[in-house]
Structures are given as structure tokens and as C-alpha cells.
Amino acid sequence: MDIFGSGEHRPRVLFICTANVDRSRTAEDLYADDPRYEVKSCGVAPFATIVVTRDLLEWADHIFVMNESEDHHVTALRRRFPGLSKEVVDLDIEDRWKRGHPELVRRIIARLEPHIGKPKAKPATAPKA
């Protein structure tokens, strides 16, 4: 199946940061209404809003972490889930902005565009007459 969903289910995309508060939630917000994907987000820290689990990793067709160099997201996943064989893409986005900040939005879109394209909203439906 290609990444743009020509198969039977929409590709499932998982966004991961540390606490699942700002970066991964912003990415989820951006793609939540995109008809091409199913999206979820979580964090690697035990105090994360939604903590990453093996079930979430198995659910995902595509896994994106926010930052390996500062936050060690890939390392944390490989350590906690040693049998993880799926590709994990590091977006290299630092933890410097709050959820929805314009610079965070710009960086997320720029880093994800080569992988899953820019976010698209679901088409609006006409009101019933």
C-alpha cells in the first residue's frame, strides 16, 4: 500500500515527543482532519499525557519522533521496546515552543512534508436544505 492510502485502510501515523503536550500534540492537531491518515500522539516519559505503548507502536504504519539529539526519543523507544522493527523517523524538532506556536507548526509541516505531505483538511459538507 502506498503512503497516500490507496489500500483498504488509511495509513496510521503516530507522533511521539517527551510529554505528549506540545510537539506531538501539535502534529496530531495539524493532521487530525486530514482524510488521508488516521493520527495519534503520545510521549516517551512516564508522566506523558498518553504514554507510548507496544499497542500504539503496532497500530502505527508510520512513526515520527520529535527529537533524538536532545530528547533521545528513538533511543527510549528501542530501549523500552527492544523488538521494535518499524522505521522510526526523527524530525529533529527541539522542545522550544508551546502547542500550536506558529514556528512549531511551520517546522512540523516542513519536516513532515517529504514523508506524508502537507496537512489537508476534510472537505466541508454542504448544509442540508
Give short role names for the model-derived ranges.
Residues M1-H62, H72, I109-A126:
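Conserved active-site segments centered on acidic
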Residues R78-A129:
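Phosphate-binding/catalytic loops
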Residues L56-I93:
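Mid-chain, well-packed structural core segment of small domains
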